[in-house]
């Protein structure tokens, strides 16, 4: 009985949510969030030097994007002396949807450890393919460590669901010769 309830009400509501999300992206005529710019390789990327409010029913936070297109304080490409630099890439979880800058896990690590400088390269909607394509830019910051905050809930599907924020992004296809196309 419990399994039937879960399949009928919980599983079907999740399926409906996904369908309506896809429908919303297909019918969107513009980017509902003003934090992103079109990018010919990545599909979209964070804006440079942007400040605005990100609001949904459950939260309202100020968002500041620096000159390097990171939701972070201004950073130099030159490393600080006596600190290891950690670059973190990821999707909306890393970017910090729903939380203030000070509440993001990368900011907490950076604030509570004097031996590390943590740079947050998170971009909402990114997945493994865009992490790979983003890597050349991240390496220009000379990180000692590069971490990927991988979200099992959607990072695999982000490789094939290739439209976000009214922008098309890179996607993968399977072919006889296994490679990224």
Go through each PLM region and give its residues.
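Conserved beta-strand elements of the Class I
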Residues: 87-89, 119, 146
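Active-site micro-motifs of SAM-dependent methyltransferase domains
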Residues: 6, 94-95, 154
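Interaction-surface signature
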Residues: 11-43, 129-181
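A conserved hydrophobic secondary-structure block that centers on an alpha-helix together
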Residues: 113-139
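Membrane/wall-proximal cationic-aromatic binding patches
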Residues: 13-112
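Active-site flanking residues adjacent to catalytic metal/cofactor-binding acidic residues
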Residues: 2, 89-90, 148-150
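A general structural motif
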Residues: 83, 115, 142-143
